[in-house]
């Protein structure tokens, strides 16, 4: 075959694989086969000197650009007017209603009833991509002033989900947002000399970096949502435009909703606010835009904003405040960790007074000092984290000092990697109290009525120094505790006795194995079925369990090597604790061994209950649709997973059809 022809075929094939992997989340080729074809293409391009502008080899270069050139957008990239209350949305909606009524009263060609399209407002860097009449990406640019941006074509090409060539023969400008996912952010920060402060700066800084290789290291993603300019036939609705974007292979977010009333808009705002911190990228609100393009054109623009769209903004999830002090606390494992005491600041609707600092290495890398202004970030409803300092605030600040002894018991501290630990396992109150509370917890041994206050008294007054000591408690001694009368003492003893009959997964979780949570405990029990089998498990056997990686496997092996661990377990068993495993019989069903994806809202099942139901039927529940998916169960407001299932020919079931099958 002619070598140029072979290059063209390889480019087409590799771009198809990239689209499947980075946009659809589904790969039809192994990494090994992809790499083989990629390097075959590299060699052919070197040999012939023939390189297509949309070849995947053109995505990443080691070039350092001398400067950014300016790019004049064909169509302006507008800012959006912003609202922070439903009342402001109502006022905007009422203006639209008034305009529509007045226009339809005086015009022969009536406008359709108002319909709004809701999409997420991404918190990254706006980009504008230009494709020529051959469908080839020719320019990537930042928003800039809205009229003129900076040419970041080389940087944009490092985003692997962005197509370098599309099936379109009209000149086109398409708008989107370059973002950094939390996974990419955490990976970059784990290796970077200077950590990034937030996801938005990670994306913006990458695209505005003249060193393209540095941009590539940040592993950016992108979502597209608007065609700014297109030669040829115009779109009639925004939904038609969004479908065009999707069919051309651009990455799009799953969330697109149609609303016609304020009540519907309010429900969507509440929904997105609830899931905001569960996303692996940042959003700062919702965009509400009129669907009908003719209505948009007639409404027009103010000097700054389009009148036909508005952004509902959420409370900020990042802020700056002053670091007042650092408090060192001892955890269940004995790890001594720093917590920042902050000048109170409002963050995502919550008053924040404390934040995570992780360890001394983290403090040094971020340059955090007492008295400095610090960047604080809140996500996933966990304790906020300090991401860095405001450099201008460092004058007159003090260094944070590492403790020399345990802040709780005064014992010697030891270093293990980047962390410090208290060695006084039995005599350090916070360690022992937290260990006992964890052991007695609802998802562990489920000792009813047990509290941290009770654990503290057991440690201080009854000299409880191990979890097995709980099963040696005596009625008369419990009466010596504060607020313990005969009834409360007996209730506690009864609850402790009842806890002896427990599931193996609850017992395993109660032991407090590092990095083993409730779900991992369940997965381990399903695989090994007995404590004895788990104790003997090899590293290879452990990592074969779903979601058990190298770190978890090593934690389990090290845990069962400890002489004290084995002594405590044997003592618990000798005291009558009886962890048992009942192998659940999986019923024969059409779902046995099948891969099932659930999308949308179901009437009779929560996400947890449908997952449990499917697993009881022998199905494997997946979070994404691919060629390997056997069934998709679609509820109300099913999103892109439904569309993808249709395009792949996957069997789609309604909730009723699913129930009829079982």
UniProtKB/Swiss-Prot annotation:
<feature type="binding site">
    <location>
        <position position="406"/>
    </location>
    <ligand>
        <name>Zn(2+)</name>
    </ligand>
</feature>
<keyword id="KW-0234">DNA repair</keyword>
<feature type="binding site">
    <location>
        <position position="313"/>
    </location>
    <ligand>
        <name>NAD(+)</name>
    </ligand>
</feature>
<dbReference type="GO" id="GO:0003911">
    <property type="term" value="F:DNA ligase (NAD+) activity"/>
</dbReference>
<keyword id="KW-0862">Zinc</keyword>
<feature type="active site" description="N6-AMP-lysine intermediate">
    <location>
        <position position="121"/>
    </location>
</feature>
<dbReference type="InterPro" id="IPR036420">
    <property type="entry name" value="BRCT_dom_sf"/>
</dbReference>
<dbReference type="Pfam" id="PF12826">
    <property type="entry name" value="HHH_2"/>
</dbReference>
<keyword id="KW-0479">Metal-binding</keyword>
<dbReference type="InterPro" id="IPR001679">
    <property type="entry name" value="DNA_ligase"/>
</dbReference>
<protein>
    <recommendedName>
        <fullName>DNA ligase</fullName>
        <ecNumber>6.5.1.2</ecNumber>
    </recommendedName>
</protein>
<dbReference type="InterPro" id="IPR033136">
    <property type="entry name" value="DNA_ligase_CS"/>
</dbReference>
<dbReference type="Pfam" id="PF00533">
    <property type="entry name" value="BRCT"/>
</dbReference>
<dbReference type="Pfam" id="PF14520">
    <property type="entry name" value="HHH_5"/>
</dbReference>
<feature type="binding site">
    <location>
        <position position="428"/>
    </location>
    <ligand>
        <name>Zn(2+)</name>
    </ligand>
</feature>
<dbReference type="InterPro" id="IPR041663">
    <property type="entry name" value="DisA/LigA_HHH"/>
</dbReference>
<keyword id="KW-0460">Magnesium</keyword>
<dbReference type="InterPro" id="IPR004150">
    <property type="entry name" value="NAD_DNA_ligase_OB"/>
</dbReference>
<dbReference type="GO" id="GO:0003677">
    <property type="term" value="F:DNA binding"/>
</dbReference>
<dbReference type="InterPro" id="IPR013840">
    <property type="entry name" value="DNAligase_N"/>
</dbReference>
<dbReference type="InterPro" id="IPR013839">
    <property type="entry name" value="DNAligase_adenylation"/>
</dbReference>
<feature type="binding site">
    <location>
        <begin position="79"/>
        <end position="80"/>
    </location>
    <ligand>
        <name>NAD(+)</name>
    </ligand>
</feature>
<comment type="similarity">
    <text>Belongs to the NAD-dependent DNA ligase family. LigA subfamily.</text>
</comment>
<keyword id="KW-0464">Manganese</keyword>
<keyword id="KW-0436">Ligase</keyword>
<feature type="binding site">
    <location>
        <position position="143"/>
    </location>
    <ligand>
        <name>NAD(+)</name>
    </ligand>
</feature>
<feature type="binding site">
    <location>
        <begin position="31"/>
        <end position="35"/>
    </location>
    <ligand>
        <name>NAD(+)</name>
    </ligand>
</feature>
<dbReference type="Pfam" id="PF01653">
    <property type="entry name" value="DNA_ligase_aden"/>
</dbReference>
<dbReference type="InterPro" id="IPR010994">
    <property type="entry name" value="RuvA_2-like"/>
</dbReference>
<keyword id="KW-0520">NAD</keyword>
<dbReference type="InterPro" id="IPR012340">
    <property type="entry name" value="NA-bd_OB-fold"/>
</dbReference>
<keyword id="KW-0227">DNA damage</keyword>
<comment type="function">
    <text>DNA ligase that catalyzes the formation of phosphodiester linkages between 5'-phosphoryl and 3'-hydroxyl groups in double-stranded DNA using NAD as a coenzyme and as the energy source for the reaction. It is essential for DNA replication and repair of damaged DNA.</text>
</comment>
<dbReference type="GO" id="GO:0005829">
    <property type="term" value="C:cytosol"/>
</dbReference>
<dbReference type="GO" id="GO:0006281">
    <property type="term" value="P:DNA repair"/>
</dbReference>
<dbReference type="GO" id="GO:0046872">
    <property type="term" value="F:metal ion binding"/>
</dbReference>
<dbReference type="GO" id="GO:0006260">
    <property type="term" value="P:DNA replication"/>
</dbReference>
<dbReference type="InterPro" id="IPR001357">
    <property type="entry name" value="BRCT_dom"/>
</dbReference>
<feature type="domain" description="BRCT">
    <location>
        <begin position="586"/>
        <end position="662"/>
    </location>
</feature>
<feature type="binding site">
    <location>
        <position position="409"/>
    </location>
    <ligand>
        <name>Zn(2+)</name>
    </ligand>
</feature>
<dbReference type="Pfam" id="PF03120">
    <property type="entry name" value="DNA_ligase_OB"/>
</dbReference>
<feature type="binding site">
    <location>
        <position position="177"/>
    </location>
    <ligand>
        <name>NAD(+)</name>
    </ligand>
</feature>
């Amino acid at each position: 075959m002619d070598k140029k022809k072979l290059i063209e075929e390889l480019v087409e094939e590799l771009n198809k694989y990239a689209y499947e992997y980075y946009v659809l989340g589904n790969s039809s080729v192994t990494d090994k086969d992809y790499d083989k074809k990629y390097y075959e293409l590299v060699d052919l391009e070197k040999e012939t000197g023939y390189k297509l502008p949309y070849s995947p080899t053109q995505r990443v270069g080691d070039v350092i650009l001398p400067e950014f050139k300016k790019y004049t957008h064909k169509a302006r990239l507008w800012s959006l007017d912003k609202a922070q209350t439903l009342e402001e949305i109502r006022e905007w909606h009422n203006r639209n209603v008034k305009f529509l009524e007045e226009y339809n009263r005086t015009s022969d060609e009536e406008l359709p009833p108002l319909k709004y399209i809701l999409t997420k407002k991404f918190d990254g860097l706006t980009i504008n991509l230009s494709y020529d009449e051959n469908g080839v990406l020719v320019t990537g640019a930042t928003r800039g002033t809205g009229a003129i941006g900076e040419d970041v074509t080389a940087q944009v090409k490092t985003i692997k989900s962005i197509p370098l060539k599309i099936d379109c023969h009209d000149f086109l400008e398409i708008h989107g947002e370059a973002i950094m996912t939390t996974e990419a952010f955490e990976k970059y920060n784990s290796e970077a000399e200077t950590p990034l402060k937030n996801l938005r700066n990670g994306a913006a800084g990458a695209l505005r970096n003249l060193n393209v290789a540095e941009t590539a290291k940040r592993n950016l993603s992108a979502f597209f949502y608007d065609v700014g300019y297109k030669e040829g036939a115009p779109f009639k609705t925004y939904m038609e435009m969004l479908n065009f974007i999707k069919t051309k292979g651009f990455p799009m977010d799953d969330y697109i909703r149609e609303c016609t009333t304020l009540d519907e808009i309010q429900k969507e705002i509440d929904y997105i606010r609830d899931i905001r911190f569960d996303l692996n990228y940042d959003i700062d609100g919702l965009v509400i835009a009129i669907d009908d393009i003719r209505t948009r054109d007639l409404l027009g623009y103010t000097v700054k904003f389009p009148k036909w769209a508005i952004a509902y903004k959420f409370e900020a999830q990042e802020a700056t405040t002053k670091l007042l002090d650092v408090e060192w606390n001892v955890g269940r494992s004995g790890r001594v960790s720093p917590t920042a005491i902050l000048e109170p600041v409002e963050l995502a609707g919550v008053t924040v007074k404390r934040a995570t600092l992780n360890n001394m290495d983290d403090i040094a890398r971020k340059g955090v000092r007492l008295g400095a202004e610090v960047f604080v970030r809140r996500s996933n409803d966990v304790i906020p984290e300090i991401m860095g300092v405001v450099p201008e605030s460092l004058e007159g600040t003090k260094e944070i000092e590492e403790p020399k002894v345990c802040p709780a018991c005064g014992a010697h501290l030891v270093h293990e990697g980047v962390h410090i630990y208290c060695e006084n396992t039995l005599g350090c109150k916070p360690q022992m109290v937290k260990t006992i509370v964890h052991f007695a917890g609802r998802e562990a041994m489920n000792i009813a009525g047990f509290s941290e206050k009770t654990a503290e008294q057991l440690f201080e007054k009854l000299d409880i120094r191990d979890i097995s000591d709980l099963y040696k408690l005596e009625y008369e001694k419990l009466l010596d505790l504060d607020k313990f009368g005969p009834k409360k003492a007996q209730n506690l003893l009864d609850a402790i006795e009842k806890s002896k009959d427990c599931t193996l997964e609850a017992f395993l979780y109660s032991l407090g194995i590092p990095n083993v949570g409730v779900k991992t405990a369940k997965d381990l029990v399903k695989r090994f079925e007995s404590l004895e089998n788990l104790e003997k498990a090899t590293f290879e056997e452990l990592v074969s369990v779903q979601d058990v990686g190298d770190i978890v496997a090593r934690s389990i092996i090290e845990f069962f090597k400890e002489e004290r661990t084995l002594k405590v377990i044997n003592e618990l068993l000798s005291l009558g604790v009886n962890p048992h495993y009942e192998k659940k019989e999986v019923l024969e069903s059409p779902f046995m061994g099948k891969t099932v994806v659930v999308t949308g809202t179901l009437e009779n099942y929560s996400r947890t209950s449908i997952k449990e139901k499917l697993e009881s039927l022998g199905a494997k529940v997946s979070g994404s649709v691919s060629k390997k998916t056997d069934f998709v169960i679609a509820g109300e407001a099913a999103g892109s997973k439904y569309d993808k299932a249709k395009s792949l020919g996957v069997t789609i079931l309604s909730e009723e059809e699913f129930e009829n099958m079982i």
